[in-house]
A protein has these predicted regions:
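Short acidic-glycine loop/turn motifs at beta-strand connectors
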Residues: 59, 77, 140-143, 205
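Anion-binding (especially nucleotide phosphate/pyrophosphate-binding) glycine-rich loop
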Residues: 1-128
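Phosphate/pyrophosphate- and phosphate-bearing ligand-binding catalytic cores of soluble enzymes
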Residues: 3, 10-13, 55, 146-167, ...
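N-terminal start and proteolytic maturation junction detector
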Residues: 174-180
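Short, structured patches in soluble enzyme cores that scaffold and shape functional sites
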Residues: 71, 85-87, 108-110, 122, ...
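A structural signal for short hydrophobic beta-strand segments in well-ordered beta-sheet cores
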Residues: 74-76, 138, 237, 345
Length: 348
């Protein structure tokens, strides 16, 4: 039932990586259950591919099964909508505009799928997907039972949820790069015990024209500031919560601070903007820029001069090129500012 030696690099936005030993696209929950059951029978490692917009496939490919849940439906009733995990965020946003449903204006131009957005609690402009989530339905890959959770049981955090944190025993091998020994992190893995099937969103009725205008503004913002002319995986690093910076901080004004690394005169002080994401953070892009890394390249990959928190595939980059730049950024930022950046991108 699986496709063999699948050119998986054709699906993620980076367009990088070797083949998957097996690939399967599930059109509904029953197909997904059968695929998981078959993978377990064959003792295959597997990971779940959504839109692939924050994913880096290794140069060697993936030795197990890549599962793509293409569960595509939108069913609405009043101000609520039940949405399949495979629905693209752009499709859901367009739906909300057409129906005059407010709540996702901030996500205009956000790539990826609903499942991926919920899993990683996607957010920007001080808003997060959790703000409108009512409930989430998932598949337990151990028991093959469907689980439905209310919002309060989904464990949403900064770019995380119970679905990204695992919630149980390992079943797949998608992992944050920060956990891999190759980048100097822990040698443990984060597993996905559950696969998101669908989510119910609670909107508020609004003016369709105003909602559409707000969405268009966010799309134009992204087009103007993000290096979308090159294959990329969006933000590589999470923004840095102000509360986690080990430094003496001087407030210059409401939106700007001066950071003085604590008890280490060899570290550099710097002035930085502060934004709500949704709590006070220093943008990772600004820190990378202050470290003098804009435009630095390795192989076919480059730290974008346009937005330094993007590492772009400028010319047939390898996964190893991307990983080398990620490691370089982490080391330079730590050495210069005593700040540890944490990856948002996922490796498989």
């Amino acid at each position: 039932m699986f496709q063999e030696n699948f050119p998986i690099h054709t699906l993620p936005s980076y367009k990088i990586g070797g083949p998957a030993r097996y690939f399967f696209e599930a059109k509904n929950p029953d197909e997904l259950k059968r695929a998981v059951e078959e993978a377990k029978k064959r003792n295959l490692e597997f990971f779940v591919l959504g839109g692939g917009t924050n994913l880096l496939i290794g140069d060697e490919g993936f030795p197990g099964l890549v599962l793509k849940p293409s569960i595509n439906f939108i069913e609405s009733s009043g101000e609520e909508a039940s949405v399949g995990a495979g629905v693209s965020m752009s499709a859901l946003i367009n739906f909300s505009v057409e129906r005059g449903l407010s709540g996702l204006e901030w996500a205009g131009g956000l790539p990826g799928t609903v499942g991926g957005a919920v899993r990683g609690n996607a957010g920007c402009f001080g808003r997060e997907i959790k703000d409108i989530v009512k409930s989430v339905k998932s598949l337990d890959t151990e028991t093959l039972r469907e689980i439905e959770r209310d919002f309060s049981d989904c464990g949403f955090g900064y770019r995380s949820s119970i679905f990204s944190a695992g919630g149980g025993s390992p079943s797949s091998v998608a992992e944050p790069l920060r956990r891999t020994g190759a980048l100097g992190g822990k040698n443990s893995r984060i597993y996905n015990k559950e696969i998101i099937l669908s989510a119910v969103f609670s909107f508020k009725k609004g003016d369709a024209k105003e909602i559409g205008k707000s969405v268009s503004e966010k799309i134009l913002y992204r087009l103007g500031r993000h290096p979308l002319e090159y294959p990329n995986a969006g933000s590589i690093f999470k923004n840095v919560p102000l509360s986690q910076i080990n430094a003496d901080i001087t407030q210059i004004n409401a939106d700007t601070i001066r950071v003085h690394p604590r008890n280490n005169p060899r570290k550099s002080a710097f002035t930085a903007p502060v934004k709500l994401d949704p709590f006070p953070v220093v943008p990772a892009a600004y820190i990378i820029s202050e470290a003098g890394l804009k435009g630095v390249s390795i192989g076919g990959a480059m730290i974008s001069p346009k937005h330094p928190n993007f590492i772009v595939n400028v010319f047939e980059a390898k996964s190893s090129d991307i990983k080398s730049l990620i490691n370089l950024v982490k080391v330079e930022v730590k050495n210069k500012f005593d700040i540890e950046l944490e990856e948002e991108i996922i490796a498989a």
